[in-house]
Amino acid sequence: MQLQLLKESGQREVFCGLTSIVWLHRRMPDAFFLVVGSRTCAHLIQSAAGVMIFAEPRFGTAILGERDLAGLADANEELDRVVADLLQRRPEIRTLFLVGSCPSEVIKLDLSKAAERLNQQHRGRVQVVNYSGSGIETTFTQGEDQALTALVPLMPQSTTPQLLLVGTLADGVEERFLTLFERLGIGPVASLPPRRSTELPAVGPGTKLLLTQPFLGQTARALQAKGAELISSPYPLGVEGSELWFRAAARAFGISDEHTTSVLEPLVTRGRAALEPHRKALEGKRLFLLPDSQMELALGRFLQRECGMELVEVGTPYLDRALQQEELDLLPADVQLSEGQNVEEQLQRVRQSHPDLVVCGMGLANPLEAEGITTKWSIELVFSPIHGCDQAGDLAELFARPLRRRGALTFA
């Protein structure tokens, strides 16, 4: 099927990859994320995480001052001092992520060499890795992709058959998924990222990859380079996507369709029942998805096929066909897709099309609301447990809620 694809470039309106630290630091409590950046970087992460500094969270910022940016001070020397002080204060840290930012990249601070140097200085005490969270060329979810890619070289090699779930899931969702895989007869099952940064799963020719998020292309390719095999499937958002996701894994491990159906059928029935009250609020409503997270195709598929919404346009920051083809195949043939962003032109199309709901970044939401256009923050979908059949009702409610709010505030 040939879908209409509009490629755009121009001014963008997205968060940077530093935002992903908010969910990654919760996933790996023995890791610390040290951003090498400006005060703006520090304010962004602290505000996004909703954590006060005196609570000693597992992230922080080594702030580049004016002398650093002007090249009048040795930023590497200062970074070494900051890391030494941090490790002395926080002896529980086992993995230290040095996270690049727009300012550190502008002054060409080589954090890969810094990581090598710090590994030598603190050998046996902590593992130091680095990745870029800069938003110069990427969107916010790609921060996780960069972080996981940085861990791949540290993963031991193995030829043992296993399933590897790639991408951060809420703990409760992951537990339910592991239980379902056990009932299906699939195992062992490992996760990347792991709950402890020092307990990285092995990977090799016997490993089959199942992605939980569509924005992990770089990680998937790094794992494939180590011999792993990617299982292609839609993503586990909504009842349909979750069922197809589990069925793809079952087929890859030789599980019969009959057994898979017997395990999944109760969940599918329960998930569809949970969807029904929200479907009534969403059915027939017109939806415009602005590019922000790379989750837009999966969300559009869910909202159109399971909730009855009409897709005006589905935008994505980057269309990775190797990871998104299964989602593309489930979208209507006449849907308008856009890749990349020219924010002024896209906002003009929003105004002209008069959608009932726009899914967009926080920076665009308030201006659109002021124009009378109902919006949903796309970043909330990354922070919320939305994966799996059991969460399908909650996922639909996230979109029904702003429509109900708008209805409650409308006066005759």
From Swiss-Prot:
NCBIfam families according to UniProt: DPOR_bchN, PRK02842.1
Which pathway does this chain act in? Porphyrin-containing compound metabolism; chlorophyll biosynthesis (light-independent)
* Similarity-based family: Belongs to the BchN/ChlN family.
Keyword Ubl conjugation among record annotations: no
List the InterPro entries. Answer: LIPOR_BchN/ChlN, Nase/OxRdtase_comp1, Protochl_reductN
Which Gene Ontology terms describe the biological processes this protein takes part in?
light-independent chlorophyll biosynthetic process; photosynthesis, dark reaction
For this entry, the protein name equals Light-independent protochlorophyllide reductase subunit N
- MF terms in GO: 4 iron, 4 sulfur cluster binding; ATP binding; metal ion binding; oxidoreductase activity, acting on iron-sulfur proteins as donors; oxidoreductase activity, acting on the CH-CH group of donors, iron-sulfur protein as acceptor
Q: Which free-text remark accompanies the cofactor?
A: Binds 1 [4Fe-4S] cluster per heterodimer. The cluster is bound at the heterodimer interface by residues from both subunits.
As its record notes, the protein acts as a catalyst of: chlorophyllide a + oxidized 2[4Fe-4S]-[ferredoxin] + 2 ADP + 2 phosphate = protochlorophyllide a + reduced 2[4Fe-4S]-[ferredoxin] + 2 ATP + 2 H2O
Is the Iron keyword given for this protein?
Answer: yes
Keywords in alphabetical order:
4Fe-4S, ATP-binding, Chlorophyll biosynthesis, Iron, Iron-sulfur, Metal-binding, Nucleotide-binding, Oxidoreductase, Photosynthesis
Q: How does it assemble?
A: Protochlorophyllide reductase is composed of three subunits; ChlL, ChlN and ChlB. Forms a heterotetramer of two ChlB and two ChlN subunits.
> Taxonomic lineage of this organism?
Bacteria, Bacillati, Cyanobacteriota, Cyanophyceae, Synechococcales
